[in-house]
Amino acid sequence: NAYTSFEETVYMLEIPADNKEILQKALLILHDWACAVSFEDEEVEKEKGVILEEWRSRQQSLSGRQMEKVLPFFLKDSRFEHRMPIGDMDVIQNISKERVVDFYKKWYKPEIMSVIAIGDISTSVLETEIKNILGTVPASEEKLELPTYSVPFNQTKDTCSFVDPEFQNTILNVY
């Protein structure tokens, strides 16, 4: 499973804690995501379809429509105000494979990745396997200085309303 937010993409694998072989396979998957993704034309086009379908699905859901309306209100005057994590569908539909590869090379770097393991597992086994498998991820040739984006604190009184025929109740929130 995975998700993308404004500042990160997180991949999650749920595996049994007591099976070393499965642990190794899971770490190999993480390794491949980190440095060995293949960008075959057909796969890039397929992934575009997945993103477009996720976007369509969000547009058809009440929570998705609400998020599209409310998030820009909360993120007013920030870089995120008009940039949903899923991206601009015109860009997604028309992006070239080369631009996708450039993005991957820029942002998928070991120095800005973390592996977090949670569960009842031997830390010595886990640490050894992480070092053995993920230790082979090559260091970046070009270092990346991570940008920082702030969301200004809104000190004015403001309101946001969201009306949708699917809403069965009236909800009032104060933030």
Predicted regions span which residues?
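Non-catalytic beta-strand/loop surface segments
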Residues: 1-21, 57-112, 136-175
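Short amphipathic alpha-helices in soluble, non-transmembrane regions
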Residues: 26-31, 127-134
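M16/insulysin-pitrilysin zinc metalloprotease superfamily fold
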Residues: 13-47
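Active-site neighborhoods of enzyme catalytic cores
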Residues: 54
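Helix N-cap motif at beta-to-alpha junctions
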Residues: 17-20, 119-124
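Bacterial peptidoglycan biogenesis and beta-lactam-recognition machinery
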Residues: 39, 122-124, 134-140
